[in-house]
Amino acid sequence: MKLTCMMIVAVLFLTAWTFATADDSSNGLENLFPKAHHEMKNPEASKLNERCLDAGEICDFFFPTCCGYCILLFCA
């Protein structure tokens, strides 16, 4: 009986928490994916457009863009 009451209270609490912290639904689907929407406006901002460097090419130690690892300024 106690377990049932605790489960009911937990479900009611989680339901109330969901409604209390939910965003305003008046926007509908407008702001559902704000980052993806921003990237569609600026396709150069997408990380999918970046090309990784092949093995043997020179890489930057602090910002490596290798497909594998950057070892001694060369992609491995």
Swiss-Prot record:
Signal peptide per UniProt: 1-22
Tissue spec. comment: Expressed by the venom duct.
Propeptide boundaries: 23-50
Entries under Pfam families matching the protein: Conotoxin
Keyword Flavoprotein recorded: no
Any one GO cellular component localisation term in the record: host cell presynaptic membrane
Keyword Disulfide bond: yes
Subcellular location(s) of the protein: Secreted
Disulfide bond annotation, renumbered to this chain: C52-C67, C59-C70, C66-C75
Alphabetical keyword list: Calcium channel impairing toxin, Disulfide bond, Ion channel impairing toxin, Knottin, Neurotoxin, Presynaptic neurotoxin, Secreted, Signal, Toxin, Voltage-gated calcium channel impairing toxin
InterPro entries: Conotoxin
Top-level taxonomic group: Eukaryota
GO molecular function: calcium channel regulator activity; ion channel inhibitor activity; toxin activity
UniProt free text on domains: The presence of a 'disulfide through disulfide knot' structurally defines this protein as a knottin.
Family named by the database record: Belongs to the conotoxin O1 superfamily.
Purpose of the protein: Omega-conotoxins act at presynaptic membranes, they bind and block voltage-gated calcium channels (Cav).
Name by which UniProt lists this protein: Omega-conotoxin-like TxMKLT1-0141
